[in-house]
Amino acid sequence: METWVNQSYTDGFFLLGIFSHSTADLVLFSVVMAVFTVALCGNVLLIFLIYMDPHLHTPMYFFLSQLSLMDLMLVCTNVPKMAANFLSGRKSISFVGCGIQIGLFVCLVGSEGLLLGLMAYDRYVAISHPLHYPILMNQRVCLQITGSSWAFGIIDGLIQMVVVMNFPYCGLRKVNHFFCEMLSLLKLACVDTSLFEKVIFACCVFMLLFPFSIIVASYAHILGTVLQMHSAQAWKKALATCSSHLTAVTLFYGAAMFIYLRPRHYRAPSHDKVASIFYTVLTPMLNPLIYSLRNREVMGALRKGLDRCRIGSQH
């Protein structure tokens, strides 16, 4: 047994992690790092393409660039520290580092959830009111949508970080997770945190179910509009417009609701760790692939970029 188990740690916490040093876990760690690399490169590339190509300077792609920025920050919040601890054999994280992880994680997950909900409204306007789309989704509205998503997430993250980090923590301070996940951290508090946990649950309900209700309402209206279309080509275009967003929504909300909206007696640390890997690493990797591989405009921008690089290298 490692020496840190028999010591108390007053300046920070110990992260028990998700991987041991068995052969199977080494393979899984390699897979997670490969996924992390793809997520990093994919989101950076998508942001770059949207910024560089004038044809992608539309509301939908502006929202997509913000989503990619959130995903990029999300994978960089927890995975590098997890990898550093695993490779070095150290399991510690400083008190300040733990607080930063909590604040960033809550902020980014909350902001992304709200943005995905408001992106559904954008799809609704594009399909149900195409003639009024440039007016209803002008630059000011787009900035308000993304700004409100970031603002709600930042406020939520700051409040929860300050409250959680002001609780007294006892004993060995071993967090049964691969990052400073708030609910795992609260189990180590020396005081009763049940009231705050109820507040967290209420925040999760708002930050997840409120945008999810916008998504359901938007797609209900979209479905009504699509059913009234008589052209097969119009059907295909409408479904293609929505399919990428629906896939991203299913991945993100499925994992987030599984963790944060389950009754407490159904929670298991091992399940939470796997679900956290899913939407902190896998979803950020899949989002740029979903939105680019199934989108002609993004693929066209990528081909033009590659052609420019090839021509430049020949000269």
UniProtKB/Swiss-Prot annotation:
Disulfide pattern: C98-C190
A GO CC term assigned to this protein in UniProt: plasma membrane
Cite the ranges annotated as topological domain Cytoplasmic.
51-58, 122-140, 221-237, 294-315
Q: Which domain of life is it from?
A: Eukaryota
| Keyword hit for Glycoprotein | yes
Q: Which UniProt keywords apply?
A: Cell membrane, Disulfide bond, G-protein coupled receptor, Glycoprotein, Membrane, Olfaction, Receptor, Sensory transduction, Transducer, Transmembrane, Transmembrane helix
Q: Could you list the residue ranges that cross the membrane?
A: 27-50, 59-80, 102-121, 141-159, 197-220, 238-260, 274-293
* Family note: Belongs to the G-protein coupled receptor 1 family.
Query: Would you tell me the protein name for this molecule?
Result: Olfactory receptor 2V2
Q: Which organism is it from?
A: Homo sapiens (Human)
List the lineage, top down: Eukaryota, Metazoa, Chordata, Craniata, Vertebrata
